[in-house]
UniProtKB/Swiss-Prot annotation:
Protein name: UPF0178 protein ECA0873
Annotated HAMAP family: UPF0178
UniProt feature coiled coil, ranges: none
Membership in a protein family: Belongs to the UPF0178 family.
Domain of life: Bacteria
InterPro entries: UPF0178
Length: 150
């Protein structure tokens, strides 16, 4: 099992948590992006650069992920495909996606798109804070412990 990261949009503070976890647990972490991603030297951390384009990184992650792998992403359609393949999807705020939360998020996204299309300014997500970072680290640790037990 390994960890895949939708790295183009993953906050640096979350990448740092993942880098430390990779070395601490000797778990392979692969960052997939359409640009060069700077990573610390480690035999447990790798990058996979894909061509620029819509969903190219997402498609590579879906192609590569195996049952039980963890994928870090804020992309709801990607999370849905990961779960369909038997993977685990976790967003950078520490929310573990389920089929129910994905359905809820897709409905909300569609609603917000409709609001924006009608001229209403909706704003974006709040800035990632220390509580979000801690929630992410806690959920990552839960997954790592489950992997060690299996």
């Amino acid at each position: 099992m390994q960890i895949w990261v939708d790295a183009d949009a993953c906050p640096n503070v979350i990448k740092e948590v993942l880098f430390r976890a990779a070395d601490r647990t000797q778990m392979q972490v692969t960052l997939v992006a359409n640009q060069t991603i700077k990573v610390p030297p480690s035999r447990f951390i790798s990058t996979l650069r894909v061509a620029a384009g819509f969903d190219v990184a997402d498609n590579e992650i879906v192609r590569s992920v195996e049952s039980g792998d963890l994928v870090i992403t804020a992309d709801i359609p990607l999370a849905s495909e990961v779960i369909e393949k038997g993977g685990i999807a976790l967003n950078p705020r520490g929310e573990r996606y389920t089929p129910d939360t994905i359905r809820e998020r897709l409905n909300m996204r569609d609603f917000m798109d409709t609001m924006r299309a009608s001229g209403i300014q909706t704003g974006g997500p709040s800035t990632l804070n220390q509580r979000d970072r801690q929630q992410f680290a806690n959920e990552l640790d839960k997954w790592l412990q489950q992997v060690r037990k299996s």
